């Protein structure tokens, strides 16, 4: 089974994260940031991933360090779980509606880290979650995993719905990208490596 367990401890955060790419029944998220827990749960469920996260952070300051560091550890786990990337689709994309909002995510498991984020999040805060941290999370995952990730809110009026559409689309796009494909021999690249 393709999986990874990693931990990261700094003076700001303490993170333990387990990711299973081929098992989807075990999802348990505890970051101390309620809205972020909800989004990670949606990502795992819609991507059909097993994901367990335990995080403690300096949320008395704000949630920035916790959200970014969870993104870093998730990216590291994804990179390790994919091993040599043989036989995977490599690319994945998904449009996901959430009521009036539409989110889009495209992924290339390329070995090159890049993140493009486009979306107007008009409400600056949802509970204890600063909405600008949505971009920070995606950027942290992309850089740690060495993937290219494009995330875009096409339209919508409710900030919660916009972010939810993105996290669901992220799960679905990543599922497509990491899926094994019997028609692909080796890695899906003319270079012979990713």
Swiss-Prot record:
Pfam family, one: IGPD
Domain of life: Bacteria
Keywords from the UniProt entry: Amino-acid biosynthesis, Cytoplasm, Histidine biosynthesis, Lyase
Subcellular locations according to the entry: Cytoplasm
Catalysed reactions, as listed in the record: D-erythro-1-(imidazol-4-yl)glycerol 3-phosphate = 3-(imidazol-4-yl)-2-oxopropyl phosphate + H2O
Record-level GO BP terms: L-histidine biosynthetic process
Name of the protein: Imidazoleglycerol-phosphate dehydratase
